[in-house]
């Protein structure tokens, strides 16, 4: 089932626990002290300017450096991908049209498992879809993130523009290819961190 604004939180890692805790604190401040705030939870972003430690930019920049992608576990972890530009327009709509104290979920119905993401990236970059290595999965790695954006769509009239994931990935590959000067200074430190963690 997809996560809805009324789904009880059930965090499975310190990371997800910290996110759940922050939402609960905001709700308490709104209710107790009248703070004018909304909450937005988004699905996984991709697109220009994303830090190269993240899944998609790391796969792209590794390929651009001649390094085979490395996929955690079996790669069947599902993420609900949303282009960063769509995320931005959704946040703007929430800030300008959202109701105080409400929670809005930002997603683009882009559920795709990580193995398929790597296969698409490989194809778009001229490699065989299965040209990647499997590595040990991270502890506490959630199997599926998917959210129900219907409240955002029905109440605020928001709609994603980047609905073709493959086209969005092609644009993202082009951006990282054309902007190596932006990410190259970060690459060595990012890969050293992953190597130190055994990934």
Locate predicted features.
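Catalytic helix-loop patch of NAD(P)-dependent Rossmann-fold dehydrogenases
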Residues: 1-39, 46, 50-52
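Conserved active-site helix of classical SDR/Rossmann-fold NAD(P)-dependent CH-OH oxidoreductases
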Residues: 20-27, 60, 88-89, 115
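Alpha-helical segments that scaffold the active site and NAD(P)H-binding pocket
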Residues: 27-31, 61, 96
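Active-site micro-motifs of SAM-dependent methyltransferase domains
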Residues: 31, 44-47, 154, 175
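Active-site loop/turn elements of alpha/beta-hydrolase fold enzymes
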Residues: 42-45, 74
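C-terminal substrate-binding subdomain of Rossmann-fold SDR/epimerase-dehydratase oxidoreductases
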Residues: 63-199
């Amino acid at each position: 089932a997809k996560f809805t604004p009324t789904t009880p939180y059930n965090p499975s890692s310190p990371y997800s626990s910290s996110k759940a805790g922050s939402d609960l604190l905001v709700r308490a401040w709104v209710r107790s002290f009248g703070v004018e705030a909304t909450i937005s939870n988004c699905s996984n972003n991709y697109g220009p300017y994303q830090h190269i430690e993240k899944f998609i930019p790391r796969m792209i920049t590794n390929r651009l450096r001649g390094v085979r992608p490395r996929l955690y576990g079996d790669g069947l972890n599902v993420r609900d991908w949303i282009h960063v530009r769509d995320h931005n327009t959704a946040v703007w709509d929430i800030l300008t049209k959202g109701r105080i104290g409400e929670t809005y979920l930002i997603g683009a119905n882009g559920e795709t498992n990580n193995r398929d993401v790597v296969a698409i990236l490989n194809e778009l970059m001229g490699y065989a879809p299965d040209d990647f290595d499997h590595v040990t999965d991270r502890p506490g790695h959630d199997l599926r993130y998917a959210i129900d954006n219907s409240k955002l769509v029905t109440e605020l009239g928001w709609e994603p523009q980047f609905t073709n994931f493959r086209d969005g990935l092609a644009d993202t590959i082009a951006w990282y290819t054309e902007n190596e000067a932006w990410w190259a200074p970060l690459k060595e430190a990012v890969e050293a961190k992953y190597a130190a963690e055994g990934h």
